[in-house]
Amino acid sequence: MKKIGAHVSVSGGVEMAPVNALGIGADAFALFTKNQRQWVAKPLSVESVTLFKENCEKEGFDARYVLPHDSYLINLGHPDEEGLEKSRAAFLDEMQRCELLGLKMLNFHPGSHLNKISIEKCLDRIAESVNMTLDKTTGVTAVIENTAGQGSNVGNEFWHLRYIIDKVEDKSRVGVCLDTCHTYTAGYDIVNEYDRVFTEFDEVVGRNYLCAIHLNDSKKPLGSRVDRHDSIGKGLIGIDFFRRFMQDSRFDDMPVILETPDDTIWRDEIKMLRSFES
C-alpha cells in the first residue's frame, strides 16, 4: 500500500504539520522545518519539538513517512566559496532540525553550477557537502531530489544522482526522491516508456536508493526542462500514468508526496489515488 500525503503548511509552528496532514486524509507528509526563503531562522523551541512528536504519535504518523524539505536558497554545488559555505551552514542547520524532530530524512535539490564550473565539478561539491553534513549528524538520510534541469540546475539526469551517491562515504545515509514532473520534463518519457524509464533508474542509480516520490502532473511538455507542477490528471502526464503508478508495488512503503498547485483539492486527489490501488 502507498503512503500518500502532501507538502503541508507549518503555519503556527512545525507541530501543526501532522494536524494539517490528518486534515487531508494523508498517511504521509512533507514540511519545511523553517522558512524556506530565509537563510537563518530561530532555533526550534523545546515546546514545538515536543508537540510535533506528540502530534505525530497521536495522529499516527511514522517518521519513515515524513519527508522534510530544505530551503530553496541552498546550493550545495555553488561555484563560489562564499555561497558554498553559506549553503553548507544552512544545510547543516536543516539536518540538525530533522535530528531534533526525530525525523529520518531530509530532501534537497542538489544544486546549480551557475554556468561557472563544469557539471562534474558541481556534483563533486555536492557530494563533499553531503559528506561534511553527515559527519556532523546522526540518523538522518540525505535524500537527493531529481530536477527538471531548469537553468543551470544539475540532477536532471540519472547519472548525476549516481555520481553523487558514488562519492558519498556513508551509503546507508544517502537516497533519492523521484519527482514525476521533474522526471518527465527532464526528458524521461514516463508516459509512453514507463517500464523502460524505471528500469533505467534501477540500472543507473539503484532501486535500493529510492526513498520517496513527489507525485505531480506537469504543465510543461516532455523534455522542456521547465519545472511547473499541475494537479493530478490535469497536466501533460495524464491520469493513466498515475493509475499505473498506484498499482506498482515498487513504490510501496515510502512517502508519496503531492506538491500539486491546488491545496484545496489535496484531499480529493489522495482519495482518487487510493481508489486506483484497488
Swiss-Prot record:
Cofactor: Zn(2+)
Entry-linked InterPro entries: AP_endonuc_2 (IPR001719), AP_endonuc_F2_Zn_BS (IPR018246), Xyl_isomerase-like_sf (IPR036237), Xyl_isomerase-like_TIM-brl (IPR013022)
Single GO BP term: base-excision repair
GO MF annotation terms: deoxyribonuclease IV (phage-T4-induced) activity; DNA binding; DNA-(apurinic or apyrimidinic site) endonuclease activity; phosphoric diester hydrolase activity; zinc ion binding
Cofactor details (free text): Binds 3 Zn(2+) ions.
Span of the signal peptide: none
Binding site for Zn(2+) 3: H182, D227, H229
Keyword set, alphabetical order: DNA damage, DNA repair, Endonuclease, Hydrolase, Metal-binding, Nuclease, Zinc
Enzyme Commission identifier(s): 3.1.21.2
Enzyme class of the recorded protein, top EC level: hydrolase
NCBIfam families: nfo (TIGR00587), PRK01060.1-4 (NF002199)
Protein name: Probable endonuclease 4
Upper classification of the organism: Bacteria, Pseudomonadati, Bacteroidota, Bacteroidia, Bacteroidales
